């Protein structure tokens, strides 16, 4: 993410999964933008790990994106707002998705935990179409965000092209 000094708005310009790196265009909180990988347009709906990353960005988050008098604004934390906007740029409707997917449990970010975690009802098959089939038909999903070092240290697998792979030095 990067801060735009002239607008005082946080904007996500790049995201990275285990195997891919994407650039995101657009300015401010306007949910219009394009995802590019090595200069070529990418549809998040056709990239399992990008889609799941964007769902995590939106659903492990308390910010609200809204438009007032033609101007897009965020209610809540600017960093969480930037994550909400990048999910919207990826084709996820924030209001509809947060209304559909129920948050069952929340462990808020604290300076001790250095992460936020939510347990969600994952019954919406269209949204969660990229869940690995090896997980079975689970109605629950846990999303977390926080310190990359802490999260990587607690992770054993990564999604690569829709498949779970052991998280090792190569990834």
Locate each region found by the language model.
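Conserved cytosolic headpiece of P-type ATPases
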Residues: 1-171
């Amino acid at each position: 993410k990067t801060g735009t000094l002239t607008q005082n708005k946080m904007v996500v310009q790049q995201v990275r999964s285990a195997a891919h790196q994407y650039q995101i265009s657009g300015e401010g909180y306007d949910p219009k933008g394009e995802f590019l990988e090595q200069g070529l347009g990418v549809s998040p709906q056709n990239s399992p790990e990008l889609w799941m990353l964007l769902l995590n960005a939106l659903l492990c988050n308390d910010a609200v994106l809204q438009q007032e008098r033609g101007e897009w604004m965020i209610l809540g934390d600017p960093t969480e707002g930037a994550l909400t906007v990048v999910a919207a740029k990826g084709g996820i409707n924030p209001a509809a998705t947060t209304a559909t997917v129920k948050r069952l449990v929340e462990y808020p970010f604290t300076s001790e935990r250095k992460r936020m975690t939510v347990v969600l009802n994952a019954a919406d098959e269209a949204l969660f179409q990229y869940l690995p089939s090896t997980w079975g038909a689970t109605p629950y999903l846990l999303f977390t965000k926080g310190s990359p070092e802490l999260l990587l240290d607690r992770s054993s697998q990564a999604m690569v092209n829709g498949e779970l792979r052991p998280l090792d030095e190569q990834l």
